[in-house]
């Protein structure tokens, strides 16, 4: 077991202690209000409480989509730490691929699930957990087959969640806003298509002094630029034909 201690530098005292599991897949994620999310094997825990109970082949709270599109983790606390967004990846339909562990005294085979080209890929959902009610909901994204849900971010008021959806052909990106309480799609703020590819790598970032404006990063003209958008203004789809890909 690991020990977690929260220290108040102003008061010069420890204000909290927790026992944490010693697991290679722990992926500890701390919220600003001291809430803690982590994974044990394929399930997600918050403050020591198991919040998912999935069988082998379904993984919660870990990175998905083979770490493409800037994805490097599977949990996302809201700005005040009151809600937790997380990935749920069903890879039970994906064939297993053997890897040899040469660090063992005698070599051992460890199987991973890896979709070969042209074969069935995993399916991803985005969940939201509320620690105060101990309830999970999942975004109503429709059938997740052949879709990438990337670059998750929160609205400053924690009432909505933003993500960038990419199709399997990776030439169409959509910036979507979902209701954090119901999981319903509120609006698609922006779309970008390209004949070659789009590659969103960064979530949107809201301006600290204006909750209605955010920065969106894109290579839509062939170069990486920052764009200022307004959540209250209709943004029409963009189609680009530059030599390089977009987003």
Model regions and ranges:
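Blade-terminus and WD-like Trp-Asp/Gly-His loop motifs, strongest in beta-propeller folds
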Residues: 27-35, 39, 74-83, 151-160, ...
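Short, small-residue-biased leader/transition segments that mark boundaries at the very start
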Residues: 1-2
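Beta-propeller fold detector
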Residues: 15-19, 48-56, 137-140, 186-191, ...
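A conserved hydrophobic secondary-structure block that centers on an alpha-helix together
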Residues: 8-58
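Short loop/turn segments that connect beta-strands within beta-propeller blades
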Residues: 8-12, 130-134, 180-183, 231-234
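Short glycine/acidic-enriched loop and turn motifs that connect beta-strands
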Residues: 43, 91-94, 167-171, 220-223
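Predominantly five- to eight-bladed beta-propeller fold
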Residues: 51-75, 86-138
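Short glycine-/Asp-/Thr-/Trp-enriched loop segments that recur within the blades
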Residues: 57-71, 143-149, 194-202, 244-247
């Amino acid at each position: 077991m690991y020990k977690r201690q929260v220290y108040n530098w102003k008061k010069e005292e420890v204000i909290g202690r927790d026992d944490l599991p010693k697991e290679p897949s722990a992926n500890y994620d701390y919220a600003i209000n001291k809430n803690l999310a982590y994974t044990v094997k394929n399930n997600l825990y918050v403050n020591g409480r198991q919040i998912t109970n999935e069988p082998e082949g379904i993984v919660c709270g870990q990175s998905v989509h083979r770490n493409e599109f800037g994805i490097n983790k599977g949990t996302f606390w809201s700005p005040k730490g009151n809600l937790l967004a997380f990935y749920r990846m069903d890879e039970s339909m994906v064939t297993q691929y053997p890897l040899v562990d040469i660090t063992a005294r005698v070599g051992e085979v460890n199987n991973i699930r890896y979709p070969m080209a042209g074969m069935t890929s995993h399916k991803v959902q985005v969940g939201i957990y509320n620690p105060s009610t101990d309830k999970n909901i999942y975004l109503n994204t429709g059938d997740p087959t052949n879709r990438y849900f990337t670059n998750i971010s929160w609205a400053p008021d924690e009432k909505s969640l933003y993500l960038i959806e990419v199709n399997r052909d990776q030439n169409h990106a959509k910036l979507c806003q979902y209701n954090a309480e119901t999981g319903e799609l509120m609006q698609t703020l922006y779309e970008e298509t390209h004949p070659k590819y789009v590659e969103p790598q960064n979530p949107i970032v809201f301006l600290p002094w204006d909750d209605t404006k955010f920065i969106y990063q894109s290579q839509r003209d062939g170069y990486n630029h920052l764009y200022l958008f307004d959540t209250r203004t209709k943004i029409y789809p963009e189609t680009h034909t530059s030599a390089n890909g977009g987003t």
